[in-house]
Curated annotation (Swiss-Prot):
Gene3D superfamilies: QueA-like (3.40.1780.10). It is found in: Cytoplasm. GO terms for biological process: queuosine biosynthetic process; tRNA wobble guanine modification. This is S-adenosylmethionine:tRNA ribosyltransferase-isomerase. Belongs to the QueA family. Pfam families: Queuosine_synth.
């Protein structure tokens, strides 16, 4: 019996200077590390992806839109407070992370952005239930800031508002971008369509939990964060058409993987059907993928659930080798970094 994998199996050394602090000059200007079906590595540029895709392949994009979820302000006592909206639960209500010297209690009012007050209604685990005086999305659009990942050290600016968002984003609700999609510009999408590559969409609202480290050595003890997703009927039909024509299902990003495989899990042994709801799907090596044949993704944090997910698709050893190669070749890592195209290992 093989030794169970532990957190240490997903660690690697990353020089801090390889963490990309800003996007490439152009969306398609990144490098692309290609891990092919024979587990061979190829150094490419992102536009080379077009030559790796075939007619009838189906690209599945996550169309979530990053909201300006970060707010700063004061408690009634004058103490500073920072709010990160995690999930909008009603037009005027949201669950949020609240950072303050002392946690606010029910009934406390928070003065935010020097513009309005939000009332603390209660708490759900680590999140605070807040009531806003107007639609949450409207207030965030007017007064919020783009919530950049914790490893990006500068404050969000106008460039981040534009570039930390995919060109096809349309469903507001994410507090982190589905970063594999950041590499696509409109000309690239049009080129792929012209060569017969199909596209479909899912929605998964990426939460701040995507950046949380795994804190247990025994992976079976990890409690996965919940994220809301939907796989529409049109995407289910597109998957069936691609399969019928011999095309591959290529997930653009790990969030698309989670949505597709969550829908498959909901269908159990039946055919894939439209699905939506919260998912806590935790994909680790040994998981049997039911929908995804290939994956476009960025490079992920050491010891993260997303590194485990890609290792489940390609194998632990090939991913470890790919990451060592990426570090040696000075690829740029994480949200604003370079991309990786992973094809399912040949049987």
């Amino acid at each position: 019996m093989p030794t169970p994998l532990t957190l240490a199996d997903f660690d690697y050394h990353l020089p801090p200077e390889l963490i990309a602090q800003s996007p490439a000059a152009e969306r398609g200007g990144s490098r692309l590390l290609h891990l092919d079906a024979a587990s061979r590595l190829h150094d490419r540029r992102f536009p080379d992806l077009a030559g790796l895709l075939r007619p009838h392949d189906l690209l599945v994009f996550n169309d979530t839109r990053v909201i300006k979820a970060r707010l700063t302000g004061q408690k009634a006592t004058g103490g500073k407070v920072e709010v990160l909206v995690e999930r909008i639960t009603a037009p005027d209500r949201a669950l949020a992370h609240v950072r303050a010297s002392k946690s606010p209690g029910p009934g406390m009012r928070l003065r935010l952005a020097e513009a309005f007050e939000a009332e603390v209604l209660g708490r759900e685990g680590e999140l605070f239930d807040l009531r806003f005086p107007a639609p949450v999305l409207d207030l965030l659009d007017a007064h919020g800031a783009t919530p950049l990942p914790p490893y990006i050290t500068h404050a969000a600016d106008a460039t981040d508002e534009r570039r930390y968002q995919t060109v096809y984003a349309r469903e507001p609700g994410a507090v982190a971008a589905p970063t594999a999609g950041l590499h696509f510009d409109q000309p690239m999408l049009e080129q792929l369509a012209a060569q017969g590559v199909q596209r479909a969409f899912v929605t998964l609202h990426v939460g701040a939990g995507t950046f949380q480290p795994v804190r247990v050595q025994n992976l079976a003890e990890h409690i996965m964060h919940a994220e809301w997703y939907t796989v529409p009927e049109a995407t289910v039909a597109a998957i069936a058409r691609a399969r019928a024509h011999g095309g591959r299902i290529v997930a653009v990003g790990t969030t698309s993987v989670r949505a597709l495989e969550s829908a498959a899990a909901q269908a159990q042994d039946g055919p894939l059907a439209a699905a939506q709801g919260d998912t806590r799907l935790f994909i680790t090596p040994g998981y049997r993928y039911r929908i995804v044949d290939a994956l476009l993704t960025n490079f992920h944090l050491p010891q993260s659930t997303l590194l485990m997910l890609v290792s489940a698709l390609a194998g632990v050893a090939p991913i470890r080798r790919a990451y060592a190669h990426a570090v040696a070749e000075r690829y740029r890592f994480f949200s604003y970094g370079d991309a990786m195209f992973i094809e399912t290992p040949a049987p």
